[in-house]
């Protein structure tokens, strides 16, 4: 991916992206949060200092894809981003498996494609970076294993969407699993099976940079 002048990079998703970011503030110490978008923003801001980039985060903790889509006008299109990085899906799988009230995989795909179509209709030059949703079964329960398998299926949907829209796809699950295996402890990567540790966020950011070649 080429990093152009005056890029506006928007990070979107759930709590993994949110990182306890500030709300309604332009305070540069807080508005990005403390998750992988902060690591990426810090790196890219310095590397491309002469290109005057801007970085925004609108991830909201607890959101599934439908909830993100419901606010997409305000938190997506109206911001006029030139690059949009999306990581979403763990709450869709969690609600579907745990409470049987989340989006089905078919609905997930439909909403995702609709969101991209509507964005490109108004911002045709916007580029997407679609990150693979991930999960780890840290408690050994059947429910967690079902959620893990559901996430794997949704990841394949995201990968196919990225291919269809000629977008960048960032694979993460196998990479995170490999680090967990190396350390012999899944919680050192995703402390509760969902949320990355400092190490986990660093792994995600490094992979994002590797795949985008930025």
Task: For the regions a language model picked out, list residue spans one by one.
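Alpha-helical cap/lid subdomain in secreted, periplasmic
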Residues: 2-4, 42-54, 63, 67-214
